[in-house]
Structure formats: C-alpha cells, structure tokens
C-alpha cells in the first residue's frame, strides 16, 4: 500500500490512529499483524484503495496478500456474503458452495484434477511439498533464492539471506528453524538455468519437487 511517502508525519495522523498504534504495540508482536507499516491503521477499503483511520488514502497493491483480487467491498461479493451470513459461515465439512468452487477450478485449470482447500498459502505449500515427498519417496526440495513460499521452515530458507553462502547451501531467514531442515533444501540462484541443471545433475535423485 503506497501513495506518496509512506513515512507519514505526525500532522497527517489523527489522535485516534496514534492511540490505536500505541495499543497495537502492547498486544501485537512488533505492533503489527505482519510485514506491514507499523503506524498505519486501516479503517476501510473500496476497490483498489484503502483509507486509514486518519483519512489518508492509499493505493492497495497487497489486496489482502491475494484474496481481495477483485478489490475491496465489491458489490457482488458483498451481496453473496450478506446472503450467506444468516445461514452460517464455517462448517468444516462439505457444502454446496465449496463443491461448486472446486468444480470451477478444475474446469479452469487443465492440470488440476481435484482441489484441496486450505487456510493459507503457507499451508498450501506445505501440503504440496508433503505430497511430492510421498509420491517421489524423496526428501529434498529445490527452491530459488529470494522466492517466497510462505512462512514454514522450508519456505523461509534463503528468502532474504542475511549472510553469504555458496549455492546450494540454504540460509535460514528466522531463528528457531531446525538444522535438519537445511539438509532437506537445495537452493538455486534465481534466473540461472545452467546452475539449476548442474544442481539437478548433482542432487536430482534426492529431490522431490522444485
């Protein structure tokens, strides 16, 4: 979300927003929901724009990190949600809407024979790696340096390395990642097909997925 300089001065922020930011620091790690601007507190969104509590407008390039693909408060989405709310929202079992969506995805994506719904991209990547390992009966994953694949231990290998390392050695991007994970990830430089070919020649029989 950017419109102009993201570093807003105190005069651009209302007392209400300053208070909310201070409250956030007490109950949220680093005072924010994630890798977002610390002092911006969003009040509403419409289409591709959002407004903070102080009334400042931003172009929203994040769009909920993907889910708000059609923009905020889209009339058709609003209508569908309002229609469903009185009927319940989360059931953890099959429902007609989920089955219909799965059918539409399968029809739209030729290689998707079936669909598994999950709660986040991190979870989807974890399942994909697990299925690949089970099918291939191999343990290693090849990933590209700088590629974001969620917040799992495997996804956070060499995302934004803070120290130099020779390829294919992975560098963990967070504390708390077991050393054993490093042995299961092979890191390739981005946009270097020759390097990937070399790594596959060396480790191909151990790699379950790229």
Name each region found by the language model:
Residues 1-7:
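Short, Lys/Arg-enriched N-terminal segments with co-localized hydrophobic residues
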Residues 9-46:
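Active-site-adjacent loop/helix segments that line or gate small-molecule/cofactor pockets in enzymes
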Residues 15-23, 49-57, 107:
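Short, hydrophobic/aliphatic alpha-helical segments
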Residues 40-62:
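Active-site and channel-lining beta-strand-loop segments
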Residues 44-49, 67-70, 184-187:
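Short, well-ordered beta-strand elements within core beta-sheets of diverse protein domains
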Residues 57-142:
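Glycine-rich loop-to-alpha-helix module at the N-terminal edge of alpha/beta enzyme cores
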Residues 103-208:
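PLP-dependent aspartate aminotransferase-fold enzymes
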